[in-house]
Regions:
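ATP-dependent adenylation/nucleotidyltransferase module used to activate substrates
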Residues: 2-165, 187-200, 271
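Long, charge-rich boundary regions
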Residues: 32, 54, 285-291
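Cys/His-rich microdomains that often coordinate metals
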Residues: 92, 266, 278
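Short, basic, helix/turn surface patches
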Residues: 116-129, 165-175, 228-244
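Catalytic subdomain that performs nucleotidyl-dependent activation
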Residues: 146-229, 234, 289-291
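Short, flexible, mixed-charge glycine/proline-rich loop motifs
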Residues: 244-255, 261-266
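Short cysteine-rich clusters marking metal-coordination/redox-active sites
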Residues: 258-262, 271-274
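Short Cys/His-rich micro-motifs in 6-15 aa windows
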Residues: 273-285
Length: 291
């Protein structure tokens, strides 16, 4: 295996990220960018990359971490988030399912086919509300090239063509209360993200979520990784094909309302977060849950 020069690798990966930000105008001068910081490799690289990009453009950064309430798992990620934010001098806002919603993921996941369903809904909801409350112009997530391919294939397999509009390095404003999102690692392969953390001895959360193996994403990820080993370049070919056949216009025809219960943006009368909370409440009542 060829030896990798750390300085050359860092220059390559940060140049790619910088070019993506510049080419798509992901960040504008004087904006406040909220980084969704889980403590995993992708979100940590996103934080470091945007901190470096402040040498090129004048904008502000804040980080937001969300503790889903997964026993024996999440606290490692929170520690990594705290350490990286502190090292870079970036404010970290810590939120949790328990404080914001009244329960931990461990308390409710058995009500669903996959724990990823309530987790994704509440995590996105908390991130958006927190970013909105601090006046953030955009939320930067750590979605990498592999994540993007997986998401597209998941939507394709489910026939959910509406989500095709979410493919791309940015999501525009579609409602005043929805903070638009950007993906600085959109064209960066997951393996390179991992290599960056190793070469630079970065403190990250290494464990896989104990619930992730049950998801469709995990199965698609395994399929892609197995075939990438046999057919090198497969992922890049898929990504290039997506870029050729899709436009990145966020053509979301659904008109968003405000949830009748919480006031958050939704395409229905009641948002998914409130629907899930009602379901959890009903299940709790049927089992005579403790106060």
């Amino acid at each position: 295996m060829a030896k990798v020069d750390k300085d050359e690798f860092n220059e390559m990966i940060f140049t790619r990220i910088n070019n993506l930000i510049s080419d798509y105008n992901l960040i504008k001068e004087n904006e406040l960018i909220a980084v969704a910081l889980s403590g995993g490799k992708d979100s940590v690289l996103t934080l470091h990359a945007l901190k470096r990009y402040q040498d090129i453009l004048d904008f502000d950064l804040v980080a937001i971490s969300v503790d889903e309430g997964i026993k024996g798992y999440r606290y490692h990620g929170i520690d990594a988030a705290i350490n990286n934010a502190k090292d870079l001098g970036i404010e970290l806002i810590q939120k949790s399912f328990l404080e914001e919603e009244g329960f931990a993921l461990d308390d409710i996941y058995s009500n669903f086919k996959s724990a990823c369903i309530p987790c994704g809904v509440f995590r996105r909801n908390i991130l958006n509300k927190t970013a909105y409350d601090v006046g953030a112009d955009k939320i930067a997530t750590g979605h990498n090239l592999d994540d993007e391919i997986q998401s597209f294939l998941m939507s394709f397999a489910r026939g959910d063509t509406i989500k095709f509009s979410k493919f791309g390095p940015e999501l525009d404003v579609i409602h005043p209360k929805l903070v638009p999102r950007i993906k600085p690692l959109w064209n960066t392969p997951e393996k390179e993200v991992g290599l960056w953390t190793v070469l630079n001895n970065i403190d990250i959360h290494l464990e896989e979520c104990p619930y992730s193996h049950l998801s469709l994403r995990a199965k698609i990820k395994a399929f892609l990784n197995n075939n990438e080993d046999v057919y090198p370049g497969l992922k890049n070919n898929i990504m290039e094909s997506f870029q050729k056949i899709l436009t990145f216009e966020n053509d979301i025809s659904t008109n968003l309302n405000e949830c009748e219960l919480c006031g958050e943006p939704t395409s229905s009368k009641i948002c998914k977060a409130c629907e899930i909370k009602q379901l959890v409440s009903q299940d709790c009542e049927s089992h005579v849950c403790d106060e």
